[in-house]
Amino acid sequence: GRIRRSQREHGSAQTQGRWAYTKRLNTELGKKIAGAIVRYAEENHADVIVFEYLEMQGKISGKKKQKLHLWRKRDIQRRCEHQAHRKGMRVSRICAWNTSRLAYDGSGAVTRDWENHSLCTFQTGKRYHCDLSASCNIGARYFIRELLKPLPATERSLLEAKVPPVKRRTSCVYADLRKLHSEMELLKAA
């Protein structure tokens, strides 16, 4: 806003310093966030850091191409990946579709609170934090993928028949992971 307004009034040459300052500030913020993520993962002895695969390609058209995006998702994920590999951790990306939209308990779509956008209401009436629910769903999708990947096709299709939502990863939630795990335990016991 402020830089663009100044650029419109005084020309682009005078505002180059402001753009450079904002860019440096943004880069520094990306470094700090990536470092904090990897440090947190290392403190908790994590083997894998799981990110949502966010759409990071494509060009911005119109007036918005002048706008400097303050959320550096690509830079943060890239820096995290380099730092994690240096420390012997893996980085995995999960499809971001419906992670925030679906409740982790399997009750269906959530309704966001109008006053506090970080809270949501499940179909069951329970109020919960949206980002925490989305984090549960992201972790569940990763574990569902890792549990099903090494299985033979016949065993995998048997489990997918018993727990149908795991067939389509964009609708997987934490409740589906729990069902899948219990079905796998029953299959091992038999």
Segment roles from a protein language model:
Residues G1-A190:
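Positively charged, helix-rich recognition surfaces that bind polyanionic ligands
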